Amino acid sequence: VSGHRVYLAGPPFAEEYRRRASALVLAAGWEPLDPMRRDFRGNTEGHEAEIVLGDLADIDSCAAVLADFTRPDEGTSMEAWYAHSQGIPVVAYTGGQWAHPWTVYVSASVHNVLEDAVAALAAALGGVPA
């Protein structure tokens, strides 16, 4: 597991989150891993296993998960649960939205502001230097 890779979990069409999160994670000295680099939007039928197994492998290769919980998304929830079940810390970003009990349970910390969530990655990563 790389000590410096952060998986960017979030809804498929959350381009602004992915852009901002990638920039903030890079600025902190870590490598963002965006699963949407394998873009199956509008073409998921017949590719379900490839999508899920690719996402799971990506999560396994990361030291932490930054999860966009600003709106409900099944994939984000499943990715966060999987990471949590594997002992990979999850930091949740809610954008001020209510945090579901499951979000709180699987997350090392929950933040309304994306910058605060990225700052919290250092604690989630056990002080891995930026």
Show which residues each predicted segment covers.
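Conserved catalytic or regulatory cores that recognize and/or transform ribose-phosphate-containing ligands
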Residues: 1-130
